[in-house]
Amino acid sequence: AAYGSDAVGGVVNFVLNKEFTGFKSDVVVGQAQKGDNQEYKGSVTYGTDYLKGRGHLIFNAEYAVSKGVNGDGRASRREETNQIPEPGNTTKTVRATDIRSPFTTGGHIINGAGGTAANNAQIRGIKFGPGGVQSPYDYGKLSTTVGTTNGFQSGGDGFRIGTSQEIVRPLTRKNLFLRSDFKLLDHLTVFAEGSYSETMADQQNSPTTHLLTIQRGNAFLAQVAPDLVARMTALGVTSFTMNRLTLERGLTESHVNDKNRRLLVGFNAKLGEWNWETSYQWGTNDISIPITNNLILARMAVAADAVVVGGQIVPRALAANPGAVAFNPFGAGSPSQAALDYVMGTTSFAETTTQDVADTKITGNLFTLPAGPLAVAVGAQWRSLKSTTRSDATSAAAGYRLANTQPFSGDYTIIEEFAEFQIPIIKDVFLAKQVTANLAARHANYSTSGDAESWKAGMVWQLQSDLRLRASRSRDIRAPNISELFTAGTQQNSNIDDTFPGGTGLTFQGVPRVTSGNPNLKPE
């Protein structure tokens, strides 16, 4: 009731020194004890009067850089510990060290297909090194990954995922602020504010893990592992599933650029014992997040199914996919640059959110009671929000391994009225230096969901200068924000543990999870 429905997680109160005069600068340099996460920050502030003191100007600029901390910079990430299912027991877990994912940079065989179960298992656990050289895959001390595409292991040949993800993201931040107020009349002051901020951050996402179905007649397999092809033929195995970390171009990375612009104009007027303030604010946020080295799933499926045509290795489905390039998955560094160009892409995502706010409020004292003046604040506010998201065609078709943000557009308006009363009840008596009651009410009308009311009733008992008791009861609402209402959907990959009795006990990696908005949400 006191702060409004947009006060979702509490209100950050700050005081702007509107009368600052002079010059101030700050420089901060630091780093973590480990010698990383270097931080550099500098700011300047200037304030001055003009036109014989009727006007005042304040300017501030800030620039900050944080180098961040990568996961491989800490032993806790290099030797990550976690709970994994006890091998052979789906109801118990053990705490294991050196946790790794079963995916490898050159790939290894999960299981065969087409033959008997026993024959399929005979080609399991073959790892491909540089040039396609075969060696046994080391499943580590403890493993839930044998013969499955999911799970974790302790030690062995798996990939330490924790080393590839930042503990602290690298960040660059720029801020500019300008404010001026001018006294037109003795009881009338106009003011204007403008601000600009830009934040740039790079984030390393999860490594590019993926599964491939390799046919026995794969052209690259025949080149690098003819003995394996012969063995598969003898066993009646027609294909196998292998996993792979495609890191030839590095990790999948998000490059965030977040810009905010804000303008505010308004006036303060003194009407006898009453204060009246009215303002209009416009703000916009532009955020773009290109994601580089993002795997295009359908293209990888086409590229990995390679055959020989006219003496050249090409995708089997080349006729249906002009421009496709065959991908050699056997061993780190084996794919050609042309193949990487074909299966990797850059996700394009941009969002613009605009907000307009008109606000007016009057504060003052209605009359004086024996314990002091009865203070009141009444006002109204109009807010309009609009958001538009744009993405590339592949994302819109959910074609990438990560993100796949869907384009959307949505808007809504809110009209609110509020009133608050501060009522002095007792003053300067035994055990009561002051007792004050507080009443507040707010009505909001949402263009998406209709009316909502909130209220608050409270009391403050000031026993003495150093002891205060406070009690309150309120009806509060939490309104959905514009993303929760209109977001079309964003896909992320998660790990899901099967902890149900009688379940597999495995951790399933890379499970797609879609988060989307709901226009039918109402304030709660």
What are these regions (language model features)?
Residues G364-A403:
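Carboxylate/His-rich catalytic cores and anion/metal-binding grooves
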Residues A1-K259, L263, K270-L271, N275-E277, ...:
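Surface-exposed beta-strand-turn/loop segments characteristic
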Residues G283-N285, P290-D305, T405-D497, V514, ...:
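Structural signature of Gram-negative outer-membrane beta-barrels, strongest in the C-terminal barrel
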Residues F23-S25, L57-F59, V190-A192, W274-T278, ...:
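Transmembrane beta-strands of outer-membrane beta-barrel proteins
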Residues V15-F20, T487-F508:
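Flexible glycine/proline-rich, aromatic-decorated loop/lid segments
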Residues G10, T21, Y40-V44, K174-L178, ...:
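Hydrophobic, lipid-facing positions within transmembrane beta-strands of outer-membrane proteins
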Residues T48-Y50, S180-F182, V265, A269-L271, ...:
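Residue-level signature of outer-membrane beta-barrel architecture
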